[in-house]
Design a protein with these regions (language model features):
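Charge-rich, solvent-exposed alpha-helical interaction surfaces
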Residues: 11-14, 18, 76, 116, ...
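Catalytic zinc-binding patch centered on the HExxH motif and its immediate surroundings
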Residues: 10-13, 17, 21-59, 66-67
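A short, highly charged nucleic-acid-interacting micro-segment common to nuclease
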Residues: 1-13, 102, 113-114
Length: 144
């Protein structure tokens, strides 16, 4: 992972610093996806909160374009903040585990990630279109 953009470097340092304070490790994989579920499901990023026995982690696949994985980092960082702040949508998803609760959480998370991208001047290209496509694909995958 070679990051040259100063805003991207600063954001990565911010995420690393804040996650460390919350017992969350920041991990980067070199592939286009990472293993993100016990059944070896794959994704571009994943957040797991810490528990009483183990540190949590944010894992990001960096094998694609940096504009894409920086967007994923903003998304997973947002999940970490939701967990830490006991955000109602995070708690609802944790409690209910339903597809609709997950979709509502992801919709909010993408909006927040796009705000972070803009606030920190991250070089993420057309992040709004990427977010819209992700949410459209997720919505289309919901059980009718």
């Amino acid at each position: 992972m070679n990051v040259r953009n100063k805003n991207a470097k600063a954001f990565i340092c911010k995420v690393d610093r804040e996650s460390s304070r919350l017992s969350v490790n920041l991990l980067f994989g070199s592939g286009k996806t990472i293993i993100s579920t016990p059944d070896r499901g794959r994704s571009e990023g994943h957040f797991v909160p810490p528990d009483e026995d183990d540190a949590g982690y944010i894992a990001i696949a960096t094998g694609g374009k940096s504009e894409q994985w920086l967007h994923t980092l903003a998304h997973e960082y947002t999940h970490m903040l939701q967990w830490f702040r006991d955000h109602p949508l995070w708690l609802e998803w944790q409690e209910k585990g339903t597809e609709i609760a997950y979709y509502k959480l992801e919709e909010y998370t993408e909006r927040q990630a796009c705000r972070l991208i803009e606030k920190h001047g991250l070089p993420c290209g057309d992040h709004m279109s990427r977010a819209d496509k992700y949410l459209r694909d997720l919505r289309n995958s919901l059980t009718p």
